[in-house]
UniProtKB/Swiss-Prot annotation:
Bilayer topology: Single-pass type II membrane protein
Subunit note: Heterodimer composed of the light and heavy chains. The active site is located in the light chain.
Protein name: Glutathione hydrolase 6
Protein's pathway: Sulfur metabolism; glutathione metabolism
Reactions catalysed, as given in the entry: an N-terminal (5-L-glutamyl)-[peptide] + an alpha-amino acid = 5-L-glutamyl amino acid + an N-terminal L-alpha-aminoacyl-[peptide]; glutathione + H2O = L-cysteinylglycine + L-glutamate; an S-substituted glutathione + H2O = an S-substituted L-cysteinylglycine + L-glutamate
Length: 497
């Protein structure tokens, strides 16, 4: 897809407002009833027997009054019943639950999965505010940079895969080659990568996406289980005072952390009009911290057409090199040519000592648009070097020609000829030999005739894995609904509407 493509705009569904039609019908009925009633009263008043003081006229007036009282009471009761009924409640835009309900993880419009509840909630808020899947994904990634510094951050390297249901094109966000700012310190590219993705495909204003992440950094956020566990394992060396108590012990579950210098960087980046300027909002104060000069040449994230592989059931999209996408395509081609896909159990998504620590998220809408993002700072808390003036932890990724084996997102469109075809998105974080694990999981999906219909109240499938690492996220578009298909057991909260 051409990187100069303009912003994507999705059609907004017209909300059904129950009760409007019923109230109009009732007003017409009231007019029909009222008109003959007035005419009949006039006839009574004009009759010869209806004279003042005459007994027949008095009875006629009494009868007319009782009739008017009965009709008025009937109309009032009907109106009260209409207001109390679901159709008469104009404040509700959703059909009654008894008519149209879904199991957890199925949504009419959009859904988001991320490793942190706060960031999934932020993504949902952006979707409800009129944003698209790119807005929600980029906003959630910026949020994770604040609340999950052990796995991602502005110092991370980002890969992404975006499918545009309006055009049918798929685009990859690719990281430039890893470059070192200093020995053991990777050059940060997170801000320019996310700004680039949003500039081409987002809908909401760029500053809007940074408002809540900056507020979380400034006013504080609760330490969740993944961050608390990482702090307990890592210790506090190089992480104080941001992630330590006053006595030097690491913050635990539920403790409140703040990062005001990171908030200042985010607010500065919100004013940037280009990916380059967004990157300099962090890089300029960072090199001052380290006493370095700005590097003359910097890696530039880019948007490229996704790799494609035609399959018997549709087409596969994934990221190009130096991610693990080309290895995934090669494995699928050789496997499909050598045997029929089977539903044999796949080995667990294992994490080894050499597996880079990473963070993944997925956003999807009911039209079929989908964004998968994965980022890494290599080790837990990256280099462990906390920049004093920016509050950012730099990665310790090494400059190497070897592919990023941890980056292997994929999207499968089931049927090229069907405009409402099912879509499957898969992204995994912190896995060893990601291409092999993803290949096995995809082959099992291809061996299934169709997306299984789960019971009405069954939650999404929970896969084994440590929260945030060795974790597979699956999102599906089926029957014009966004589905959260699979999440790791006990973590990766999802939201939608």
């Amino acid at each position: 897809m051409d990187a100069t493509t303009g912003p994507v705009h999705y059609h907004k569904l017209q909300l059904w407002e129950p009760g409007v039609e019923s109230e109009e019908e009732e007003e017409e009925e009231e007019e029909e009833i009222a008109e003959p009633l007035v005419l009949s009263l006039r006839r009574l008043q004009n009759t010869p027997r209806n004279e003042v003081g005459g007994l027949p006229g008095a009875w006629a007036r009494l009868l007319a009054g009782l009739l008017l009282l009965a009709v008025s009471s009937s109309l009032a009761l009907r109106q009260l019943h209409s207001r109390d009924s679901p159709r008469g409640n104009l404040g509700s835009v959703a059909p009654p639950a008894s008519r149209h309900s879904h199991r957890p993880g199925v949504y009419h419009h959009s859904a988001i999965i991320s490793p942190a509840a706060t960031c999934s909630q932020l993504g949902q808020e952006l979707l409800v505010a009129g944003g698209n899947v790119v807005d929600a994904g980029v906003g959630a990634a910026l949020c994770l940079a604040v609340v999950h510094p052990h796995a991602t951050g502005l110092g991370a390297t980002f890969w992404g895969l975006f499918y545009n249901s309006s055009s049918g094109n798929s685009t990859a966000l690719t990281a430039g080659p890893t470059q070192l700012l200093a020995p053991g310190l990777g050059l940060p590219t997170g801000l320019p990568a996310l700004h680039l993705l949003h500039a081409h495909f987002g809908r909401l204003p760029w500053p809007h996406l940074l408002t809540k992440p900056a507020m979380l950094a400034e006013k504080g956020f609760e330490v969740d289980a993944p961050l608390a566990n990482a702090l307990a394992i890592q210790g506090t060396k190089g992480l104080c005072p941001l992630f330590c108590h006053t006595n030097g012990t690491p913050l635990g579950l539920g403790a409140r952390a703040t990062n005001p210098n990171l908030a200042a960087v985010l607010r500065s980046a919100a004013l940037a009009s280009s990916p380059d300027l967004a990157g300099k909002a962090l890089l300029n104060p960072l090199v001052r911290d380290l006493g370095l000069e700005l590097p003359s040449a910097q890696p530039v994230p880019s948007l490229e057409p996704a790799l494609q592989l035609l399959l018997p059931r549709g087409v596969l999209f994934t990221t190009p090199g130096p991610s693990a996408g080309p290895e995934l395509v090669e494995l699928l081609e050789s496997t499909l040519h050598s045997r029929t896909p089977s539903s044999a159990p796949c080995p667990p998504f294992l994490q080894t000592a050499e597996t880079p620590v990473s963070s993944a998220l997925a956003t999807v809408d009911s039209n079929g648009s989908m964004l998968l993002l994965i980022s890494s700072i290599n080790s837990s808390f990256g280099s462990g070097h906390l920049s004093p003036s920016t509050g950012v932890l730099l990665s310790n990724l090494e400059a190497s020609p070897a592919p990023s084996a941890w980056a292997c997102p994929l999207i499968l469109r089931d049927n090229l000829d069907d405009t409402e075809a099912d879509m499957l998105g898969m992204v995994a974080s912190g896995i060893s030999r990601g291409a092999k694990a993803m290949t096995c999981t995809l082959l099992n999906h291809l061996a299934t005739p169709q997306i299984p219909q789960q019971p009405q109240h069954q939650r999404p499938t929970e896969s084994p894995g440590i929260c945030g690492q060795g974790a597979l996220l699956q999102a599906v578009v089926h029957a014009e609904h966004a589905h959260v298909s699979s999440v790791p057991s006990g973590c990766c909260p999802f939201q939608g509407y």
